[in-house]
Amino acid sequence: MMNHDTESHVKISRTIYRGVSPSTTRLESRVRELEDLLDLERDARVRAERHAADLGFQVDALSERLDEAGGSTTQTQELLKRREMEINKLRKDLENANASLELAETSMRRRHQTALNELALEVENLQKQKGKAEKDKSHLIMEVDNVLGQLDGALKAKQSAESKLEGLDSQLNRLKSLTDDLQRQLTELNNAKSRLTSENFELLHINQDYEAQILNYSKAKSSLESQVDDLKRSLDDEAKNRFNLQAQLTSLQMDYDNLQAKYDEESEEASNLRSQVSKFNADIAALKSKFERELMSKTEEFEEMKRKFTMRITELEDTAERERLKAVSLEKLKTKLTLEIKDLQSEIESLSLENSELIRRAKAAESLASDLQRRVDELTIEVNTLTSQNSQLESENLRLKSLVNDLTDKNNLLERENRQMNDQVKELKSSLRDANRRLTDLEALRSQLEAERDNLASALHDAEEALHDMDQKYQASQAALNHLKSEMEQRLRERDEELESLRKSTTRTIEELTVTITEMEVKYKSELSRLKKRYESNIADLEIQLDTANKANANLMKENKNLSQRVKDLETFLDEERRLREAAENNLQITEHKRLQLANEIEEIRSTLENLERLRKHAETELEEAQSRVSELTIQVNTLTNDKRRLEGDIGVMQADMDDAINAKQASEDRAIRLNNEVLRLADELRQEQGNYKHAEALRKQLEIEIREITVKLEEAEASATREGRRMVQKLQARVRELESEFDGESRRCKDALAQARKFERQYKELQTQAEDDRRMVLELQDLLDKTQMKMKAYKRQLEEMEEVSQITMNKYRKAQQQIEEAEHRADMAERTVTVRRVGPGGRAVSVARELSVTSNRGMRATSMM
């Protein structure tokens, strides 16, 4: 559909070329100016595309180099992939722009009535390209001189690298001597290790003896604990017996008191009985005479009672005596028991003191046993650490040997790279010879292009003659159009009745236009919101990419720091080894001192305070010996630190020499790559010039064919110009507006293309500076971050441009509405001024044709706005 519209537009422009309106000259000049500007914009676009292709090629080459340089990190690869995706996206955008521009170019080519300006512009472009080729030639000559100077510098750098290699060989010999010293120290360490292992075995035997003694002490402790338990049990039994004896003593004391009371009662009874006996005797003496007869009868009873009482008294006296004796014996037993109780109390106190002393000794023995066990564990741990440190020292020695081997390999690699640089210098010389040969070919091609330029000038002269003929035909068509204008003015008076229907149709078409414009506005707003969301998502993605790039930059900074730390680790390796050795010797002294302390403490358990004093003196003497050993070790550490500083200085000199050699190698590689890129660029430009020449030749032939077709169509258009003059003028005006809008779009697209070309050129310059500083990856990533920020700004600028375009379309809509209102006003004025007359069928047909032309113009305007 779009192609059909463009073809109709082209046909309209070709038919109007011989119109009869007085404003056609102005419109035609405007059309020619627009076409000239479009041609200039197209040529600028072609140059921008060519330059963008070159920049894309260079960006691809530099991206490959960046891939090779940053292959160690996956994050930089992802970043480069994103950059490639963005470049591909930009290429797609350029291709889409190119496609749209090509479509516009085809439509403009069909509309163009002459090709003279294009041929003149092609000639000017060829001249400009010739001047550009000459400038490139001079630039290449200057670059060849620079390359020769760089080759001289490379030879000088080679000589300096050879001298540095000799210095590195001397340093390598010195490092070999240092490795021999380290090997000798390793043998000494192995001897010390064997001595330590023998001492470790002795310590293990001593430890076993200590463990046996600890077992004996534990057995003695258990026996002492059992004795203490027996003594505790016996003490408890004695306490119980004492309590029982005290209870018996109290019970006996109570019995004694009872017996004493009974004895007192019995003695009182005996005294009472004696008093009664005396009374009885007195009664008997008094009553002897009275009771003489009874006395004689009762004497036997009395004697019997007396005998009973005497027996009772004797029994009581015997019991009292027994009780007195028992009391005396109890008193003696009491005194004896009190003495025994006092003795038992003193014995219990002594036993408690002995028990507390034994408990204290048992606790001391337990603490001593735990200390001995802890020290034995510490000794075993220290022995294990010494063995692990010894293994670490051996591994570090092997690592030093591997580092020495790596240095030798790097030396060999530098020699191979030196030979490769010599080969590259030879290849550069051959490429210079090829470039000179290509320059001669370019000069021959220039002569051919000058001959073709002469041919094009002759063709231009022929085209100017054809243009003169076409001007004559145009004047004739102008006269015909004037005649047609007079006829149309006569018919215009006859179309008063048609104005009402025309007004209705215009109002209807205006309503349709308003509906379509509202739909277009809604569609455009939705499209604008979608584009805005898409650009916002792109901005968010770019911000995410910026964050990832920042993270990648931080990771690369960390890796750079890690690489620098690696060199520092190599420098501090000897210091660590010496520190480990010092720690091992200190640990050995500590273990020996602890062993002696253990032996002294075991002897302290067996011996007295005098042995402890002797052991203290012995420990002081050993401390003095340890201090002397520490002083000797400090002297050794000082010597080792001096050796370390000397080795650090040698390593720094070697590192600087290696950095200089690597920098010289990279500089030569960069120069070779730049020369290869320049040679490829010249070859591409040569091919492009050949393609441009072929394209110009084909375009010239095509334009000749189109000129013939245009002349035929112009002759056909002369017949139809009398009928369609006014309609064609209106369409021409609409087409001029469309061309102006297209010219604005083309100018914007050209500006965008130029901005993209400038951006590509800026990216090329940035990438070129990155290629020169390829070794510093952090700066390259910073440049990539800057580019992403610029791209974010470009997207924001594009979003703002889209908003500006929407504003422009709204302004155009308002302008079109104003034009419609002005047309209605003019129609009203014409309706009021033109006399009301009946119109014929011819006039009605003209009005219907005019109405159809107006509706078609509005439809075309609506499609162009969409």
UniProtKB/Swiss-Prot annotation:
GO cellular component: myofibril; myosin complex; myosin filament
UniProt keyword annotation of Metal-binding present: no
Signal peptide: none
Primary location group: cytoplasm
InterPro entries reported in the protein's UniProt record: Myosin_tail (IPR002928)
Region spans: Nonhelical region: 1-22, 840-866
Coiled-coil stretches noted in the UniProt entry, renumbered to this chain: 23-839
Domain of life from the UniProt record: Eukaryota
Cellular location(s): Cytoplasm, Myofibril
UniProt entry keywords in alphabetical sequence: Coiled coil, Cytoplasm, Disulfide bond, Motor protein, Muscle protein, Myosin, Thick filament
Family annotation (Gene3D superfamilies): 1.10.287.1490, 1.20.5.170, 1.20.5.340, Vasodilator-stimulated phosphoprotein
Family classification: Belongs to the paramyosin family.
Subunit structure: Homodimer.
UniProt function note: Paramyosin is a major structural component of many thick filaments isolated from invertebrate muscles.
Name used for this protein in its record: Paramyosin
